[in-house]
Amino acid sequence: MDGPAEPQIPGLWDTYEDDISEISQKLPGEYFRYKGVPFPVGLYSLESISLAENTQDVRDDDIFIITYPKSGTTWMIEIICLILKEGDPSWIRSVPIWERAPWCETIVGAFSLPDQYSPRLMSSHLPIQIFTKAFFSSKAKVIYMGRNPRDVVVSLYHYSKIAGQLKDPGTPDQFLRDFLKGEVQFGSWFDHIKGWLRMKGKDNFLFITYEELQQDLQGSVERICGFLGRPLGKEALGSVVAHSTFSAMKANTMSNYTLLPPSLLDHRRGAFLRKGVCGDWKNHFTVAQSEAFDRAYRKQMRGMPTFPWDEDPEEDGSPDPEPSPEPEPKPSLEPNTSLEREPRPNSSPSPSPGQASETPHPRPS
């Protein structure tokens, strides 16, 4: 099966990159609300989100990757791009990730790009209540990737320190309070995952977790291939797995977001693909923060099915053979924070093959 064709319109993405550079100089680090959900000013607008919600431009062979921010978006994009090309890495090595899987809701979004070839691969962080309405009467497919929300908090906190469009996260305690109240970009993690899980059981919806990919990447890739109706032979499958490890993505300038201007993503202050691990929250949460999170989680997720991160919160998955080489020097949400972490048992995180995050705006998140 043929995957999407590479660059369709001469000069389109050159113009796009110019737009990004101009926009990135004007990011105020403030939020506006669309139907109650917070969005960063600059990369999003009322008009761009309304277009994503109300467009009729949905094709039956469209593939949507849906995540809450910092839940594995980059990883899933890389995997699906490789699947669509039957393991051939030339596409992921030559075309920026935001061009391969443009965002639905950014001001230069997937639905505003002309003449895209099928099948289209698109990304979104939108909660289900404002996602593209036309999808729900189509045969288009959604892959929703979840992640331990404790790891999401840590990753989003660090990302907020380098992303020009986001508010300064403040202290670790303040950021955790904001996260638990849904006062962060794209709103409540709890509402996001609970909303999308209403789709579970439908033929065009796949729910998979970061932790499942970490524990069994090859098996997870085979599951995704089955969902997409794109089975791969042994050699192609091995290539998908090999080229979607954390180290492979971190070394790929088309996937690690280092092509973005510092005003949008300041890599001098930290890497977008930071560690690529599961369980890193144990190196950052204080006991008090962990207890506060657990209380909110139990209340919000009562009646929901068990997730991989619920089975034993003190146990991590098996280690990845290619862990990130960069150790975190001080255990806290932020280095040198005044919040000292009390000792926790079994607090060593296990490396994972890839960390996602996120961007047709090359909005990494």
Swiss-Prot record:
Matches recorded under InterPro entries: P-loop_NTPase, Sulfotransferase_dom
Free-text description of this protein's post-translational modifications in UniProt: Phosphorylated.
Residues covered by region (Disordered): 303-365
Disease cited in the entry: Ichthyosis, congenital, autosomal recessive 14: A form of autosomal recessive congenital ichthyosis, a disorder of keratinization with abnormal differentiation and desquamation of the epidermis, resulting in abnormal skin scaling over the whole body. The main skin phenotypes are lamellar ichthyosis (LI) and non-bullous congenital ichthyosiform erythroderma (NCIE), although phenotypic overlap within the same patient or among patients from the same family can occur.
Outcome recorded upon mutating E22A: Increases the cholesterol sulfotransferase activity
Principal subcellular localization: cytoplasm
A single GO BP: steroid metabolic process
Annotated positions binding 3'-phosphoadenylyl sulfate: 70-75, 147, 155, 210, 244-249, 274-276
Catalyzed reactions: an alcohol + 3'-phosphoadenylyl sulfate = an alkyl sulfate + adenosine 3',5'-bisphosphate + H(+); 3beta-hydroxyandrost-5-en-17-one + 3'-phosphoadenylyl sulfate = dehydroepiandrosterone 3-sulfate + adenosine 3',5'-bisphosphate + H(+); (24S)-hydroxycholesterol + 3'-phosphoadenylyl sulfate = (24S)-hydroxycholesterol 3-sulfate + adenosine 3',5'-bisphosphate + H(+); cholesterol + 3'-phosphoadenylyl sulfate = cholesterol sulfate + adenosine 3',5'-bisphosphate + H(+)
Coiled coil region boundaries: none
One GO term describing the cellular component: cytoplasm
Free-text comment about domains: The C-terminus, which contains a proline/serine-rich region is involved in nuclear translocation and enzymatic thermostability.
One of the Pfam families matching this protein, by short name: Sulfotransfer_1
Tissue specificity field: Expressed in the stratum granulosum-stratum corneum junction in the skin (at protein level). Expressed highly in placenta, prostate and trachea and lower expression in the small intestine and lung.
Main function: Sulfotransferase that utilizes 3'-phospho-5'-adenylyl sulfate (PAPS) as sulfonate donor to catalyze the sulfate conjugation. Responsible for the sulfation of cholesterol. Catalyzes sulfation of the 3beta-hydroxyl groups of steroids, such as, pregnenolone and dehydroepiandrosterone (DHEA). Preferentially sulfonates cholesterol, while it also has significant activity with pregnenolone and DHEA. Plays a role in epidermal cholesterol metabolism and in the regulation of epidermal proliferation and differentiation.
EC category: transferase
Effect recorded for S21A: Increases the cholesterol sulfotransferase activity
Temperature section of the record: Optimum temperature is 37 degrees Celsius. Retains 70% and 20% of activity when incubated at 42 degrees Celsius for 45 and 120 minutes, respectively. Activity is lost after 200 minutes incubation at 42 degrees Celsius.
Name under which the protein is recorded: Sulfotransferase 2B1
Residue ranges, compositional bias (Acidic residues): 309-325
Stated consequence of mutating S348G: Abolishes nuclear localization
